[in-house]
């Protein structure tokens, strides 16, 4: 598991208190998340001219809440979290966080949605790639240069009660 895996989520009413939020050590990520949240997505809602949403996860090892902008890829209310890491050789930390704790939050503009992550494979994964490629011309290059099979997680709507029930 990635030793830097540290991302998080808020908890439901009546459950354990939310983990402390630790902003990203990356100035770009930290500033983008702060602008996005302060303006309900009116600012900080793009990266390289492409739309993003804010993914809030729980650190796999630390339990600390982390927030990251990810590309906005959505179909029928389900979001895709594409672990491309801009074509880097490793998966982003949030990917490992979602494997360890699949409940997360997506903020899409002013709307925050509770989601549950599940890795997609085969034909379902290809369908997500087709949608993602149509909106982001960089993904094909990332797949060609990363040297790895880039994972995709479907972020499906979840209810707070799902986590405690």
Model features per residue range: what roles?
Residues 49-84:
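Short beta-strand segments
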């Amino acid at each position: 598991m990635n030793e830097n895996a540290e991302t998080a989520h808020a908890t439901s009413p009546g459950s354990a208190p939310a983990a402390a939020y630790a902003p990203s050590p990356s100035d770009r990520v930290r500033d983008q998340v702060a602008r996005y949240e302060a303006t309900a997505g009116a600012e900080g809602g793009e990266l390289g001219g492409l739309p993003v949403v804010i993914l809030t996860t729980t650190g796999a090892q630390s339990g600390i809440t982390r927030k990251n902008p990810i590309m906005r890829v959505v179909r029928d209310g389900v979001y895709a979290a594409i672990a491309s890491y801009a074509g880097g050789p490793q998966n982003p930390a949030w990917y490992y966080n979602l494997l360890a704790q699949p409940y997360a939050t997506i903020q899409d503009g002013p709307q925050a949605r509770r989601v549950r992550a599940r890795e997609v494979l085969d034909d379902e994964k290809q369908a997500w790639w087709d949608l993602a490629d149509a909106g982001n011309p960089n993904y094909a290059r990332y797949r060609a240069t990363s040297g790895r099979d880039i994972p995709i997680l479907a972020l499906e709507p979840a209810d707070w009660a799902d986590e405690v029930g």
